[in-house]
Each structure stands twice: as C-alpha cells, then as structure tokens.
Amino acid sequence: MVYVLNIEGKPLMPCKEAKARKLLKENKAKIYKKEPFTIQLLFICENQTQDITLGVDAGSKHIGLSATTKEKELYAADIELRNDIVDLLSTRRQNRRTRRNRLRYRKPRFNNRVHSKKNGWLAPSVKQKIQTHFKVVEDIHKLLPITKIVVETASFDIQKIKNPEIHNEEYQQGEQLGFWNVREYVLFRDNHTCQCCKGKSKDKILNVHHIKSRKTGGNAPNNLITLCETCHKGYHNGTVELPKTIKRGMSFKDATFMGIMRRSFYNRLKEIYPNVFMTYGYITKDTRIKHNLPKDHYIDARCISGNPNAEPLGYYFYQKKVRCHNRQIHKSNILKGGKKKLNQASYLVKGFRLFDKVEFEGQICFIFARRSSGYFDIRKLNGEVIHRSASWKKLKLLETRKSLSMERRALPPIT
C-alpha cells in the first residue's frame, strides 16, 4: 500500500503499488517519503476520501495505532517509548549536587523550582511520553484523511490493588498513618530488627536500605528494608548477600503514569481534532476475545477503532523513540592529569550520524554506534546485531536520523 498526498500536500486515500509505479513513471507524482512509502501528486485531482477511524492504544511503554475503514486496515504501528529518562534525570541531579557540594559557601538552591507550582505542570519524564503520543497521531494525520479518533485510556485504583477490601475513609488512612516519616514506618514494620541477620550481629545501629537503587526503585516503603550497620556495610562491600526472600514489592510506576496522562492526553487531543472519543480496556479485551484475535498493541488498536473485522494490512510499522541529542559536555570520570574526557562526538562521521537508516549487504538496519575511523555498529531496532564494525564504504544511506526510527515488519504467524 502506498500513501498519497494531493498537490497541496493534503492526504488522500492510499493506492496500490502498481498505480503508484504508473504515476511515477508518467511523471504525474513524486516520491514524498520512503518509510512509509508516500507519493505526492503533481496534478490537480478530486479530493474524494472515505471515513477513516484511528484507534490509539495509549500506554506507558508502547503505543498501538491502527487506521481502518469498515472493510480494510490502512495503517498499523507499534511505537516503543523511551524509558531511560528517569535514570538520566537522576544522573544529572547527582552530578549537579556533586558540583555544588564543592562550593559550600554558596547560598543553597532548593526552593526556587517555580515550574512545579504552575497549573498543568508535568514531570519531564511524563511530559516526554505524552508529547510522543501527540506526535505519532499528528504523523498519521499527514498520511491519511482521518475523520475520527478513538483513544483507549486506563485508570487504576492503586489502593484497591494493594488492598482489595479497602473502602470509604480507609483511602485516607494509608499504611504510614501516624508515623513521622517513611524511615520510622519501615523500622516499625520490620520490628526494629535487621532483616538479613535477624539481630545475630548484636549491632544496635539500624539503617534503612534500598532493595533496588533509589534511582530506579524510588523511596516507596516496599523498596526499603531494615539492615543493621554491619550487614549494610558488608552488603555494599560485597561480603554479605541479602536473603533471596527479600524482594522489592510491586511497582506502580506504569499505573501512576496512565493515571496522570489519561485526562491530559484526551482533553488536549479534543482541542486539536474535532471527533475524539474515549473507550476503555475491558471493552477492547471483550472485542478481541469475541473475534479470536491475538494480543498485540496494534491489534488492540484495531479493536479500539471499532473495525476488528477489517482486512489486516499484512505488515506493521515498528517505531522506536530515540534520544535526539546528549548535551553533556564532559564525562564524569576524571582522567589522569585532572582532565575530563569529552562526551560530544563528531556531528558527522564519513557522512553518517547516529540512528541513520542504512543498507548493509542487502539488509536494512540502523547505526547504533560509530567510530571516528569510519566503522559503525549496525543493528535492527530490536537490538539484533548485524555487524559490530562495518566500514562506511559498505553502507548506503537510506534516510537520515529522525526522533522516531521506523522499520517495516511482517505480521507474526498466527498459532
């Protein structure tokens, strides 16, 4: 299937490959985009379109998209979102605090973050994911004349997940009610006893230890455990191992994100596009089971669009959101001589950039790493290694890098 734009750049109904080849051969159209393949007409034509519904399966790690008519699916995509932003923000915060710790005479800055006081402010990690949702919807509107959007969002009762029998005022009476802080609660919960040696070390000094690092696990009580000073130091020195029974509790990061983005995404989408509707996960699941469809993000999106019986496209587009630019000038480690290694790579290496789409020995892949000598680590978007040190002389540039890398994939066989 080939997507078509009119002479003014507005989307029309897609056509078959043979029709597109004929138009290109007769110089009645030009290539507008290679992935997904799109042509633009060079003559004035009637702008006849059909009703197309876009189903959006919103998520915290993946987005499913499917544009359908009643008879046929016209577009299907699975978008992988970035999940490294929280770690990067934590690393940046750690570096910033380390720098300021060397200047103790400087007046501390801790209460002048005015952005968080503004109405509608979102954390950078959440904001970036929501912006990606808007971008992929906008990109499809540039390819197809979408007339209706249906979005599946989800709301999670985290307190109900923790305690199925909770009701009424118990929602305001959480597990930390009556305690000054999290540390006091964790010590009380663990009966002021080391959870590693159970008090055998006779060490009276107790520490609250993060099971997973604070950077990735957070400060929630289910990520904290009581350890004595002896076990705590021994664990960090590598001489003590925690019992296998000590595990981090259930994480609700994804559920929290969906609760934040639910109304924010839907309400703003209604301001941009005219016909936007909301559906829910239980409706999608019921539709998928009734039509005996496998579970996948783009298949859920087809069910969300209201046309589960539409003829499948036969393939789908896998997209991955990549980092656009690393603004860190130096590495953190100090080299011999008190110097810091530069963190900025060359803008171009032999005419190629990071995440450029290239062809190598008949295979389409992406540049994942580069060397100034002109050798590249090339892979598929799923991380499959094609060659760890391919010469630039053997590479053919297909597309320059974009914030959303895209590759076409065949549908998996139905079992």
Language-model segments: residues:
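Short, flexible, mixed-charge glycine/proline-rich loop motifs
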Residues: C45-N47, G178, V182-D190, G218-N222, ...
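Charged, flexible boundary elements
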Residues: C15-N47, E175
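Glycine- and charge-enriched low-complexity intrinsically disordered segments
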Residues: V56-A58, K380-T415
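Short cysteine-rich loop/turn motifs with clustered Cys
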Residues: K142-K148, F179-N207, C228-C231, R353, ...
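Short beta-strand-centered aromatic/proline hotspots
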Residues: D356-K357, Q363-R379
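Substrate-contacting helices/loops that form the catalytic groove of nucleic-acid
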Residues: N47, T68-L177, P243-G351, L397-I414
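Histidine-centered nuclease catalytic patch
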Residues: Q195-T226, N237-L242
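Gly/Thr-rich phosphate-binding beta-strand-loop-beta motif of the actin/hexokinase/Hsp70
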Residues: Q50-T69
